[in-house]
A protein has these predicted regions:
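Amphipathic alpha-helical linker/stalk segments
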Residues: 29-60, 68, 72, 111
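Helix-turn-helix
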Residues: 1-26, 30-31
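Short amphipathic alpha-helical segment with a characteristic S/N-K-E followed by hydrophobic residues
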Residues: 23-28, 38, 90, 94
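Short amphipathic alpha-helical interaction/hinge segments
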Residues: 32-35, 39-43, 72, 88, ...
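A conserved beta-strand->loop->alpha-helix hinge within the catalytic CA
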Residues: 5, 51-56, 123-126
Length: 173
């Protein structure tokens, strides 16, 4: 997409777009950050005092599952995979704008859960990576390949509950 097309879609001049975003990469990163912030706000990774750890993890898993299953996220994932071989910086921009921020939030939450004695986690970053990989799992792989639709309703809820159960059993005190 050209900056002309972005300006036309936004109903502003190209100069206005460039005054906010110096190039397409900056615009792309801003869009990814905004989407992640809406679906997985920073507040989601702040551990509410006295909340059961499984409920906190379920809330995060539900939001993440909804994000990765959205039509926009599926299209973006496919685009990044296709463009990555042509321009690796495209994937790097995406990672910095979205997944890295989400991982940092989850890492901090898990570090806090460990310090409170709620879970036993030696490496919170690695545990955060495992958590999100479990949520994605085979259903996301099938979705990206076009072999299946997104998990919805009871099926999505059963999936995230199973993931959280596995995660808690792996890291219980």
């Amino acid at each position: 997409t050209s900056m002309d097309a972005v300006a036309a879609a936004a109903g502003v001049s190209k100069l206005t777009v460039y005054s906010h975003f110096t190039d397409k990469q900056t615009l792309f990163c801003s869009a990814v950050m905004a989407t992640c912030q809406i679906q997985l706000p920073d507040l989601l990774f702040e551990y509410p005092e006295g909340a059961p750890v499984d409920e906190v993890l379920l809330t995060i898993a539900r939001n993440f599952q909804a994000l990765i299953s959205s039509d926009e996220a599926v299209k973006l994932s496919r685009l990044i995979m296709a463009q990555g071989s042509l321009d690796p910086s495209f994937g790097e921009y995406f990672y910095e704008a979205g997944p890295k921020r989400v991982l940092a939030g989850m890492e901090a939450l898990l570090r806090g859960a460990n310090e409170r004695g709620l879970l036993r986690i030696d490496n919170p970053l690695r545990a955060a990576e495992h958590f999100f990989c479990l949520v994605k799992g085979a259903p996301d792989y099938r979705l990206l390949l076009g072999c299946a639709g997104p998990l919805e309703g009871d099926e999505a809820e059963a999936h995230v509950r199973e993931v959280v159960g596995v995660f808690i059993r792996a890291f219980h005190r």
